[in-house]
Amino acid sequence: MATLPRAAAAAAPSPAAALLPLPRAAPLLAGRAAARSAARRLRARGTRAPPLAAARRGWGGVSPRAVLDLPRRREAAEKPAQKAADLNEILSERGACGVGFVANLKNEPSFNIVRDALVALGCMEHRGGCGADNDSGDGSGLMSGIPWDLFNDWANKQGLAPLDRTNTGVGMVFLPQDENSMEEAKAVVAKVFTDEGLEVLGWRTVPFNVSVVGRYAKETMPNIQQIFVKVAKEDNADDIERELYICRKLIERATKSASWADELYFCSLSSRTIVYKGMLRSEILGQFYLDLQNELYKSPFAIYHRRYSTNTSPRWPLAQPMRLLGHNGEINTIQGNLNWMRSREATLQSPVWRGREHEIRPFGDPKASDSANLDSTAELLLRSGRSPAEAMMILVPEAYKNHPTLSIKYPEVIDFYDYYKGQMEAWDGPALLLFSDGRTVGACLDRNGLRPARYWRTSDDFVYVASEVGVIPMDESKVVMKGRLGPGMMITVDLQTGQVLENTEVKKSVASANPYGSWLQQSTRSIKPVNFQSSVAMDNETVLRHQQAFGYSSEDVQMVIETMASQGKEPTFCMGDDIPLAVLSQKPHMLFDYFKQRFAQVTNPAIDPLREGLVMSLEVNIGKRRNILEVGPENADQVTLSSPVLNEGELESLLNDSKLKPKVLSTYFDIRKGLDGSLDKAIKVLCDEADAAVRNGSQLLVLSDRSEALEPTRPAIPILLAVGAIHQHLIQNGLRMSASIVADTAQCFSTHQFACLIGYGASAICPYLALETCRQWRLSNKTVNLMRNGKMPTVTIEQAQRNFIKAVKSGLLKILSKMGISLLSSYCGAQIFEIYGLGQEVVDLAFCGSVSKIGGLTLDELGRETLSFWVKAFSEDTAKRLENFGFIQSRPGGEYHANNPEMSKLLHKAVREKSDNAYTVYQQHLASRPVNVLRDLLELKSDRAPIPIGKVEPATSIVERFCTGGMSLGAISRETHEAIAIAMNRIGGKSNSGEGGEDPIRWSPLADVEDGYSPTLPHLKGLQNGDTATSAIKQVASGRFGVTPTFLVNAEQIEIKIAQGAKPGEGGQLPGKKVSAYIARLRNSKPGVPLISPPPHHDIYSIEDLAQLIYDLHQINPKAKVSVKLVAEAGIGTVASGVSKGNADIIQISGHDGGTGASPISSIKHAGGPWELGLSETHQTLIQNGLRERVVLRVDGGFRSGLDVLMAAAMGADEYGFGSVAMIATGCVMARICHTNNCPVGVASQREELRARFPGVPGDLVNYFLFVAEEVRATLAQLGFEKLDDIIGRTDILKAKHVSLAKTQHIDLKYLLSSAGLPKWSSSQIRSQDVHSNGPVLDETILADPDISDAIENEKEVSKTFQIYNVDRAVCGRVAGVIAKKYGDTGFAGQLNITFTGSAGQSFGCFLTPGMNIRLVGEANDYVGKGMAGGELVVVPVEKTGFVPEDAAIVGNTCLYGATGGQVFVRGKTGERFAVRNSLGQAVVEGTGDHCCEYMTGGCVVVLGKVGRNVAAGMTGGLAYILDEDDTLVPKVNKEIVKMQRVNAPAGQMQLKGLIEAYVEKTGSEKGATILREWEAYLPLFWQLVPPSEEDSPEACAEFERVLAKQATTVQSAK
């Protein structure tokens, strides 16, 4: 085969940075190769590459690729009282990274190990982030053993005695920049050591090269020194480490009040390990720290870390590794973890501390990152006598339930986890953790396996772990083992014994240390299930009074409780939440309505609670949580509940448990002396009662508003306020671990309310009034008659209550999963909410640490709102039925809905008549509405004189900033979708395809229109020649439906939908009844088959993953801008910073009030935040971090007028999205039945007869947007501005409006009115800048080859070979884009045979088209074959290896994601989620991780080896064949949809054998060849997984021919 010069060079440059001067024997490659390599490094950072000459700066002309390509030869090593956690502070630091370690099993220190770690670090630069200067890294670092040779050399030169390795501690210290402060800090440090009896041997200034540091990092760079101390009073190694730990804690306490306290930081203080780190790019770490270039720096291991932080403000201490851990991930439950650790401070004791526990507090720091706090807790356990592996198992447990291997082979491991489940809440979230105490080095993965981790071992006794393969040059013949860490797995290297322990070996060793199983049997008890009550406990009048008093509405009962009782699931609704925020409403609201659920986006993924429930649990333990530092049977003395939702009998069981000593606290307050101050006083009394009860030994506090008879002057305290206040009070007084809180309440009936109570401290809830309402409903005459007449499914009274609780539990799992949290025990007290409308007084009392940006109600005002419900139950004219507040459905006299019938009618009149007067009436209607959104509290102002409107930019310019929302073709009809697209194209705006692809017929302008009709689009009217129905914005959503190479290359912009305003953190499902033949064709599925979109993108589990997808999309379509859609919530600014650094062109902020075709009511009402706050935070954060000019800011959510546009512009938005109102202008009548497929005007229906009623024409929407633009122009003229550019980011033109709200006058708008400055560029300049580039890429080299370009242009066949490295990402994506643009997805008749050798970077072979035959000899990272539409992709290991290919992990996670065609053959194992959302791809592999074939809708997958758990979850189409040689497959398959059967159909046998034959031919697989040789023996060992849509296919139906013949006979007979 012909080979390009790049591939032919024996020492082609490698991307590991020129981290160190190369050994003299190494060839120095300069010139073009070095420059190209430098440019490649810059593009790996996600920035536009500068001129190559500039890129070469700091490299010294040395090619880094030479490092990887040098022949490697191992040589023998030379022997020689704190406040609660505050969400604002926590959210300011989020991150992700690339990590790894190198370890020598002989424990022989070597400079080569350090060198290899730095090389690997340089090869993961693309996994890190940089600041706005493109030079200051987010952080990188290295942990190693202490380089004693280096330090003794220094000691010798200083005239000091040699350092004693057994009792010398070394501290790596960041000191204040100011010289005087530094000396003061050093004096305090030295004094603490001296006072502790340690001898300070000296200080060493760490040598560094400041010239390589970026500007931002240099400005904040500390003085970096090392301190050496002698520990004379201890001789045990662990005691020495403990003494050094105590000293560090004492130093922190001694310097706490110093002005320079935040500038003093110990990176490490140990006699075993040391950490070098900083705000540096990975490639310059070794250049900055000159020690790392010194060959005397020798260590038997090294952990390395590259950070990608969403916060770009340089903070040197937050670089990693930390003192024990290197963490790639995010802890979702951090606020709760910190609060619980604070609660433990009073009870943590251990003999090893010799009574000095009080000196090492606190154990957490809210100002530090989640990684730093996890490290701190792990270090506490380690210094208290736990091993690193045990500490990790306690803090980050695996999903041990539903784990057949553990339950059968390792029950002691399950006992260990069950024991600690009640002692330590899991630190939950995606995490790859590397750890070392200097004796053990290891790595573990979170329970969901949401970070990549590969490992390999060599014959010369080295073990490597890394986020990616290919980061270190390797002689493959020496590799004896290749593997990957799966969910919850661990690997450790014992440096003292040379043992490598893999997963269950580690855990069995730890779990066998104590008899945890017998302790559990001895002390832990469970509540036995208690039957539900079978009769009502109250009469109808009493129930009604209770419902009125506690805030129920008829909607709550009929649409929520009764639906849950009858169906066992949450009610679904549609459109968005268009009512006022609770604090702005004139109607009374329950306290729960002031809280919005937070959710995962970008930095961590949501979870699918339906298809991945095996990793989730609602179990909770009740009782005292004792001393975590000691073990024993008494710690297991608790009660286990299977869920937090109790019926009356189960609550009674808890109350009868004498060991718990339960105390019931009444939650009423007395208003006989007036309301003012009464609620505050009652809360204080309640907290005092709780305090006394716990001090007297109570382990269970039951807060109850249950009463025999309600009293008019004794209203109930809002139960959420009571729970939160007691929870916070007990934390502050060190009592929280001593008791659990249970709520016995009438105030809880929706899943959101349960979640709030649990999130603020309740362990369980008994919703007695909701259960009574279920009983009353079931026994009502209306319900009985409906069931008797068959109009409602028959349920018993017990079943109604069981259904209700089932729905609550399902809803709780969904709420947890939105945030990526798996365990209710971790969610409890984690405060995963944002508050809208409560003042600081209320927040500090009960919700301390939660974000409440706009202030709001005082305690007295909250008391008045509570009382407004209560008095209705006792007034003389009390209604005989519950009031309908109209919170869900618009109704006369109910709550105001922005999308109301009158508004729709006025807008229809204006756009259909093209009447300025009618639009003015529409404007007046909006202006006269009640306060509905935050911007209604603001008005525009100007110190300029008005100008003639003729001087203002034209409407045609303004409308170019308008976009419509991403509405999928499937959720809405084809007519609506196309009419909107045509309208937006006419005005130069942009429509959005939504999920589901696009018909290619829409990509060409119409030229056949007569009288408004076109044969091309016969279902539309009002057309014009030249119209195009394409959507300028093509959406890439989690399901990847319709995402093909041709779809992407025909996009002007590509939107990555991370979240949707109406249901953030959730996926979706298009019901089978909406999947018509047309929809199925576009989505590469079958008609009538339900199509599931996962909650997360399965290639976006972190910020660096998002950067990779952005890279992939820029790769296939370098002309399309990439936008990322986020939903407003606290912390969105830091997320947006990360998105900007990830090379996005556009960031879209969506408000909570956006529309949806279908969503649970609780999500519509209680998730996401106002776009005003989200936009302000995003704009200001980007300005502060110097990133605003990089991205266009787009905002949407409830836009209806030009005033909305102007408000958004003043807050910083460049472009503006319209969703629901665009549908209304096109014909929507707001019937709010989108989710039923029964839209009366065919806007949101796939039913042909309803679609025929569609009234809209594109011109209506054109008219609307021109009206809005003219409104903008008129207002700009009044304000004295000539163009929108002039006001963007100008918050100074906003002022608070004088509005008298019904509930409070304490709304604080300063957050919206504050300014961080203006961008350096105008909005028009930002919008018109070029698409962000990936920089030089390997695909450009491929396309530059004349043979390949000729083959593409003239459809010929060509064969080529190229070298590939892990920094070569999305390889072949650009080539595929060129082919797709020219020939479409199936039109290329040529053939490109391209072979790569080496280790491929992420997304290898993405978006392949037919005619591309790609072969990789080596290995690959994650996302192989992503989005491929055709072609062939083969991955095989190198010919000479030291491992068995079928046992080795050859490719990474999430391969074949969203494939719509082609074949993949992998000789070896793949990672998690192989073939996730595969549509039509075929594949053969030799083993997979968990979740294989998840959400698959078509195609065929063959696995010739073992698979992980949860196979075929959500699989609605396609077939899978899995070889089950050891009879272990059955419990691993998710049988909710698919059925398992042997391969009996002849067509199925032919399909299976044919694929294996092709596989063997392409890969040379010995395993495959053996199967074919012994076909008759192996065939019975295969299982076929068949979803319902494939049951009648010839491959699955053994009697297909007979059935077909019978059907033919039946048809013939009928004739």
Swiss-Prot record:
Residues 97-496 form the Glutamine amidotransferase type-2 domain. It catalyses: 2 oxidized [2Fe-2S]-[ferredoxin] + 2 L-glutamate = L-glutamine + 2 reduced [2Fe-2S]-[ferredoxin] + 2-oxoglutarate + 2 H(+). FMN binds at residues 1175-1232. This is Ferredoxin-dependent glutamate synthase, chloroplastic. Involved in glutamate biosynthesis in leaf. Required for the reassimilation of ammonium ions generated during photorespiration. The lineage of its organism: Eukaryota, Viridiplantae, Streptophyta, Embryophyta, Tracheophyta. [3Fe-4S] cluster binds at residues 1228, 1234, 1239. Expressed in leaf blades and at lower levels in roots. Keywords: 3Fe-4S, Amino-acid biosynthesis, Chloroplast, FAD, Flavoprotein, FMN, Glutamate biosynthesis, Glutamine amidotransferase, Iron, Iron-sulfur, Metal-binding, NAD, Oxidoreductase, Plastid, Transit peptide. The gene is GLU. Belongs to the glutamate synthase family. Its cofactor is [3Fe-4S] cluster; FAD; FMN. GO terms for molecular function: 3 iron, 4 sulfur cluster binding; glutamate synthase (ferredoxin) activity; glutamate synthase activity; metal ion binding. GO terms for cellular component: chloroplast. GO terms for biological process: ammonia assimilation cycle; glutamate biosynthetic process; L-glutamate biosynthetic process. Pathway: Amino-acid biosynthesis; L-glutamate biosynthesis via GLT pathway; L-glutamate from 2-oxoglutarate and L-glutamine (ferredoxin route): step 1/1; Energy metabolism; nitrogen metabolism. It comes from Oryza sativa subsp. japonica. InterPro entries: Aldolase_TIM, ET-N_metabolism_enzyme, GATase_2_dom, Glu_synth_asu_C, Glu_synth_asu_C_sf, Glu_synth_centr_N, Glu_synthdom, Ntn_hydrolases_N. The active site is at 97 (nucleophile). Its EC number is 1.4.7.1. Residues 1-52 form a transit peptide. Its main location: plastid. Pfam families: GATase_2, Glu_syn_central, Glu_synthase, GXGXG. Binds 1 [3Fe-4S] cluster. It is found in: Plastid, Chloroplast.
